[in-house]
Amino acid sequence: YKEKISYIFMLEYTSLDGTIIQVGQNAKENDELTVSSSPQYWWMHVAGCSGAHVVVCHEGEQLPKETKKDAMVLAVHHSQAPATKMSCVDLTRVEHVMWMRQAGKVKLTGEVMELTIFMRREKERLERLLNTK
């Protein structure tokens, strides 16, 4: 994979278990984050609306449950999804995210899991994460 490019404005958070979670803040950062990440890292995006690409820097077979929830909360927080409702988040490996020519647009191939999160229940989690960047 490409050598990771570090942008000053790209957001980086730390889950409770110490896993790094990176978040793009705009289309260019989303593209760079996705193409420069290890193919085995995990990628998330809120389904059906504009928002940040979230990459969990973990190559394991499965994401730890709490790290997965942390990344989901960040994906919803950095999207246009209403924070008071249930949100669906797509989860796949970076290798299954195909970059399109239009900035910020991707096509998902391979296995994609759709996860659900209720942001009303995750206020404390979000506060903790926002304090780690």
List the predicted regions and their residue ranges:
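Duplex nucleic acid-engaging cores and interfaces of nucleic-acid transaction enzymes
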Residues: 5-133
